[in-house]
Amino acid sequence: MKFFVLVAIAFALLACVAQAQPVSDVDPIPEDHVLVHEDAHQEVLQHSRQKRATCDLLSKWNWNHTACAGHCIAKGFKGGYCNDKAVCVCRN
């Protein structure tokens, strides 16, 4: 029994040592790659802000109003509710 425990510990130590090998500092992306030459700072033309996530996603379990109120309280408002268009409306 002690032999099996010793072998198991030795195997675990060997696995830890094998996984702790240093990672090479060589960049695997070649210089002529398409993404390397693209401009890194491209302007975003239009943002898409989805305000219906809390009301739409949780409406199946009837938690939509609770989640909306919690979301509004976390933002610093007094509470909130989901209107008929499934948009969270926060109260002042």
Curated annotation (Swiss-Prot):
Disulfide bonds join 55-82, 68-88, 72-90. One of its GO terms (biological process) is antibacterial humoral response. It holds the Pfam family Defensin_2. The keyword Endoplasmic reticulum does not apply. Its main location: secreted. It is found in: Secreted. Gene3D superfamilies: Knottin, scorpion toxin-like. GO terms for cellular component: extracellular space. Changing residue 15 to T: In strain: 2CPA12, 2CPA43, 2CPA46, 2CPA51, 2CPA103 and 2CPA105. InterPro entries: Defensin_invertebrate/fungal (IPR001542), Scorpion_toxin-like_sf (IPR036574). Keywords: Antibiotic, Antimicrobial, Cleavage on pair of basic residues, Defensin, Disulfide bond, Immunity, Innate immunity, Secreted, Signal. Residues 21-52 form a propeptide. Residues 1-20 form the signal peptide. It comes from the Eukaryota. Hemolymph (at protein level). Induction: By bacterial infection (at protein level). The keyword Secreted applies. Responsible for the anti Gram-positive activity of immune hemolymph. Expressed in the absence of immune challenge during metamorphosis. Belongs to the invertebrate defensin family. Type 1 subfamily. This is Defensin. It comes from Drosophila melanogaster (Fruit fly).
